[in-house]
């Protein structure tokens, strides 16, 4: 079931990252208190990595039991292990290498020099199997229940590696697919699909900067998900857009309360 998006607009991208990090700490701690563990889907890009860096610098990060946290990824650039452009490599540098995570609960997407070689479709199928193995009978489909799933929003409204009009955004059954011919490098990627994204309890969409203003306006104005993938990303209980003032500059103020600016 779709949830109407809530908007929170911060003064600048630094404040947005700090506030989002504080919000994420609270969600993780609450999930661990109520269910014993938490499950979060990370996003790459400047806003996703900025949030992780803010979390690394937050004293309250120690409230998290890092050994009871599962980390997944919404998408990945299909490159060799350790490549600096891979989302997992950047996440390790920003946060993961500085906290006591259980390595078995860090679920990176396959690399192009892994057991599946350069077969991105086989790599995507393997990640789908890993998700299915972690799902329980109480979960919504063949994926575990994600407490928070974060997505960066591209200037073209793409989220994860779901680009406008490409086959991946049209997928209705599979939870993970390989992407061929992405319009930004590298062209080959692995991504969660919209059906997988929509199983999350909460979906957070992050956008900062003037180059994201038109994308936010399009996605929040009722555009179709094939033309504007961000419009099709929503959670079961909450959909949250976290923006800075520049990214919100083309939105009518009626969409968000003045107090959030």
Regions found by a protein language model. Name each.
Residues 42-47, 151-155, 208:
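Glycine-rich beta-strand-to-loop/alpha-helix junction loops that act as flexible
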Residues 1-40, 121:
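N-terminal glycine-/serine-/threonine-rich phosphate-binding loop
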Residues 195, 201-261:
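ATP/nucleoside-binding phosphotransfer catalytic cores, i.e., glycine-rich phosphate-binding loops
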Residues 60-70, 99-101, 168-169, 195-200, ...:
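Short, conserved loop/helix-junction motifs that constitute active-site signature segments
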Residues 3-4, 64-147:
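Ligand-binding beta-strand-loop-alpha-helix segment within the catalytic cores
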Residues 148-195:
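Class I SAM-dependent methyltransferase SAM-binding "motif I" and its flanking Rossmann-like core
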Residues 54-65, 89, 164-173:
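A glycine- and small-aliphatic-rich helix-loop capping segment at beta-alpha/alpha-beta transitions
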Residues 32-58:
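Glycine-rich N-terminal segment of FAD-binding domains in flavoprotein oxidoreductases
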